[in-house]
């Protein structure tokens, strides 16, 4: 499997009692119909660590049903140890997802050997197309490129690496050392065009939840060599990304970023997203007004 293009890390709609599967189905249907290459519901943006295992499986069942072979369905583990990762991965495999994205162990800052051992334990037990992942603002550490290289050399089911580090020099190392064998996928919307220009194969991004086909247009422009147009579109979006941030990397609101993506999706698409799941905070009226202005400036509302 060679993953190229845009995989959408979707938000998870909630009611006061649980996941709003009707709204989820509507959102996924719109994203797939817009032509995106894949969907990734159990993501950081989708509040995966706040979903029960049963909710995660049900979310992926809905995604698989909606995609219907028209888009890749990627499932994220969202777990911090190898036993839980193996358990949820096997359940995802039973659902029939197309690929697995493995969340690295978090809470403790692990060394190279521990990270490598974690991947070995999981991949020895789970044989399905797999995307490795680094997200240091959630784990407290960045995974050395050499660890990804070792794991990819040993396990043929590894097909890609998602990079949400925000460290562009590190990202260039991934492209240089792994890009010929694996799909290097940018995890931050604000770095998507620069990544494509330097040779990344695509992105796993949350912006398309509310941007419509804009992210696909960025991808198309780069692939067609229309670099000036791609850069102009990138720069047009920068005020939005500076406000919203991504993984807490930039943005005025820091840890509220998953809520912002959810609110933006409801404003633009008119789908009931409900509240974030605690302890994620809601945004206040001032933040909402600023978000609405930015969306209006882009012609989205």
Curated annotation (Swiss-Prot):
Signal peptide: none annotated. One of its GO terms (cellular component) is cytoplasm. InterPro entries: Aldolase_TIM, DapA-like. The keyword Cytoplasm applies. It comes from the Archaea. Pfam families: DHDPS (PF00701). Its main location: cytoplasm. The active site is at residues 44, 107, 133, 162. It is found in: Cytoplasm. Keywords: Cytoplasm, Lyase, Schiff base. SMART domains: DHDPS. GO terms for molecular function: 2-dehydro-3-deoxy-phosphogluconate aldolase activity; 4-hydroxy-tetrahydrodipicolinate synthase activity. Its EC number is 4.-.-.-. Belongs to the DapA family. Homotetramer. This is Uncharacterized DapA-like lyase Pisl_0309. It comes from Pyrobaculum islandicum (strain DSM 4184 / JCM 9189 / GEO3). The lineage of its organism: Archaea, Thermoproteota, Thermoprotei, Thermoproteales, Thermoproteaceae.
